[in-house]
């Protein structure tokens, strides 16, 4: 008799958002300006998030979608009630650093910001929802960028430590699952968002990125140390933008190219989960003339304070080639990939690969042997509501169901340890990559368009009831 495939009874089902993509209220109650506020929609967006073009304030002629976003700051009770109706066990959200320390380098926090998140966490618990909190999700106070150069500056360790100490102390008993940095490997692809970096002409960009990465890695270790000291119940995770790099062919040079691309991603988690810099990275820095300044104390912190679990986003797999003539690209999560002829793609060119999620789960488990948490997964699509705001999003249901099956197989047939799953953008929000509203992920439709027009009214999509059933049956409803 075949054993029925199931999820653990303790499995944490839920959804995920980020402060800068949903809260809005960019200047409410003492909040300071952050890098994510000044990234406009349109053709300059990519140059700004990659640090090639400087924009440190709002400028005429641009639309900044994060200023209002979906106004969750004023509507969180309504939104969390909807999450509760779906039966969420967990809700992943992030803290806007500049709500807590408006400039980032103050000695005392902003009480209004602390109170907002306290109220939000209490609202979650009212519905039996466990908060999963990202300390920084592409979020850096602009003052820290203008005054100190963002994460290139070692002083950021002090400011981040103060933020963490404040959060862990204030929310002790309210939050026990923490992520230190969202998609930490994005520093290599979107350095202004990932680390508040802007580059000067002629500067060695890779040198700056890896120095900033070192500071973030040490900051993550400091956060892990503090979290465990302040509350031994705390669980701290790292967070990676994941997705396996398949070789374009079985030619050894393509296999090698895929391995090299994977190493660029896993480099960060190698440090956070294993506690030391991998030899391949040291050798690469040597070859490329990159000198990362670090102290013995840094190395000790990294070694002694590794993460409790590994979390990641998964949207698509990627393809790599060692042949420079192979160059048919397709879009992905900020960074592009070679096209995979065996896969279908979303409207934005992201390749749909549920088996790739199972492969990624196994790769991460084999590499680290630490519990995992899938904290982003979903399908960005154009949704067309009827006159009542209802969207029959069967395409989203199909995408998510296929990925739920892949998780279930990885748990039951491969033996990976997976704590939970939060779909990305459980309510429609502003896209981090493009700044669009029309690229929707949610179970809940929000009446707002790319120009900021709309009532912000919330309405349930077909996928709302589907996911409610998935959670109620602990995944058994997905056949």
Model-flagged regions — what are they?
Residues 2-60, 85, 103-105, 114-479:
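Active-site region of glycoside hydrolase catalytic domains
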Residues 61-75, 152-154:
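Active-site mouth loops of central-metabolism enzymes
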Residues 66, 73, 104-107, 347:
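Short, flexible active-site loop motifs that bind/organize anionic cofactors or intermediates
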Residues 71, 75-96, 304-310:
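Catalytic domains of carbohydrate-active enzymes, especially glycoside hydrolases
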Residues 95-109:
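Glycine-rich, proline-tolerant flexible connector loops at the mouths of alpha/beta enzymes
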